[in-house]
Amino acid sequence: MSRETASSEITPELLLRAYACGIFPMAESVDDPTLFWVEPKMRGVVPLESFRIPSRLARTVRSDSFTVTVDTAFDAVINGCAAPQPGRNNTWINHRIRELYIGLHELGHCHSVEVWRDNELAGGLYGVRLGRAFFGESMFHVVRDASKVALVHLVARLIAGGFVLLDTQFVTDHLRGFGAIEIPRRRYRALLDVALEGRADFGALPLDRPVPGAEALKAIADRSS
């Protein structure tokens, strides 16, 4: 699909079909109104069975110095992900990307994890759920460790719900610290095919209340039981 026509032709429903084929849209910048499809030769994934948490971060999660919720402030999270951050002045999240993923959220296929401190949004992440796969789109923080806490809570929810694939699209140094790896496209597609079979439960951990850090850590610790 050409860059000039992609933006107008993509719908939330088409976007889901694209994810099932292993592709996703991006924009060059927040000011570029057009979108283009991406299918990396090397795909970033976080193997849930070997997800690791640095000990300092585990203490932060357990301390509940942050309050973590799900799907209570989706628009605010995607706006936070689109905003400039230290070391990241440009963003690929343009207006059309916002519209599409808000549409997916309204269909129940896109979720946010919000991290709060003193009733202010300190960080979070959002991504797409399809079958037993979760596709992480973006994360942000305005308070140290907030996005990392969001990721720990996301992984706990995925493990508790029977998910088998956490797709990060690309791998950063930040994600490598949690065990993220790159795999070839063919291997990724094989994992995706398996993940699209069956269903997982994003609500295996409570959706209607904040989840304590100890509960999230226990879900991760119990993954092999």
From Swiss-Prot:
Any one GO molecular-function label of the UniProt entry: leucyl-tRNA--protein transferase activity
Catalysed reactions listed for this entry: N-terminal L-lysyl-[protein] + L-leucyl-tRNA(Leu) = N-terminal L-leucyl-L-lysyl-[protein] + tRNA(Leu) + H(+); N-terminal L-arginyl-[protein] + L-leucyl-tRNA(Leu) = N-terminal L-leucyl-L-arginyl-[protein] + tRNA(Leu) + H(+); L-phenylalanyl-tRNA(Phe) + an N-terminal L-alpha-aminoacyl-[protein] = an N-terminal L-phenylalanyl-L-alpha-aminoacyl-[protein] + tRNA(Phe)
EC annotation from Swiss-Prot or TrEMBL: 2.3.2.6
InterPro entries hit by this protein: Acyl_CoA_acyltransferase, Leu/Phe-tRNA_Trfase, Leu/Phe-tRNA_Trfase_C, Leu/Phe-tRNA_Trfase_N
Compartments in which it is found: Cytoplasm
Pfam families, A to Z: Leu_Phe_trans (PF03588)
Gene3D superfamilies according to UniProt: Leucyl/phenylalanyl-tRNA-protein transferase, C-terminal domain, Leucyl/phenylalanyl-tRNA-protein transferase, N-terminal domain
Its job: Functions in the N-end rule pathway of protein degradation where it conjugates Leu, Phe and, less efficiently, Met from aminoacyl-tRNAs to the N-termini of proteins containing an N-terminal arginine or lysine.
Name of the molecule in the record: Leucyl/phenylalanyl-tRNA--protein transferase
Species of provenance: Nitrobacter winogradskyi (strain ATCC 25391 / DSM 10237 / CIP 104748 / NCIMB 11846 / Nb-255)
Protein encoded by which gene: aat
